[in-house]
Amino acid sequence: MTRVPRGYIARRRRTKMRSFASNFRGAHLRLNRMITQQVKRAFVSSHRDRGRQKRDFRRLWITRINAATRIYKVFDSYSKLIHNLYKKKLILNRKMLAQVAVSNPNNLYTISNKIKIIN
């Protein structure tokens, strides 16, 4: 049988996959089958880790706020601070509170005083 030259479609698909794998090492960079497997694996990991990143950052913010409230004796605990914020309808998310707690603890103290005064 004579050899049938393939069209450009398969080559275009492979070069597209190869462009995704440009930073891989070894066979994961050179062999087409390995490239497709590893690129699929990388997409799965990136999709999973986008959700995980949100959880991790939320945990980090909560830890920072909790540490700051205990160190600067703003409240007894993080949960009491958040409870009073919701009770007084002060709209501050955890990211903003963590930023305040890390960069300028005096502002965290004034926020807590506002909560206590409203009580």
Swiss-Prot record:
Gene3D superfamilies found in the cross-reference section: 6.10.160.10, Ribosomal protein L20 (1.10.1900.20)
A Gene Ontology biological process term: translation
Keyword rRNA-binding: yes
Signal peptide region: none
Keywords: Chloroplast, Plastid, Ribonucleoprotein, Ribosomal protein, RNA-binding, rRNA-binding
Highest taxon of source: Eukaryota
UniProt subcellular location: Plastid, Chloroplast
MF annotations from Gene Ontology: rRNA binding; structural constituent of ribosome
Gene Ontology CC entries for this record: chloroplast; ribonucleoprotein complex; ribosome
Location, primary (coarse class): plastid
Family matches, as PANTHER family: 39S RIBOSOMAL PROTEIN L20
Function as written in the Swiss-Prot or TrEMBL entry: Binds directly to 23S ribosomal RNA and is necessary for the in vitro assembly process of the 50S ribosomal subunit. It is not involved in the protein synthesizing functions of that subunit.
Family: Belongs to the bacterial ribosomal protein bL20 family.
NCBIfam families: rplT_bact
Protein name, as recorded: Large ribosomal subunit protein bL20c
Protein species of origin: Agrostis stolonifera
Gene: rpl20
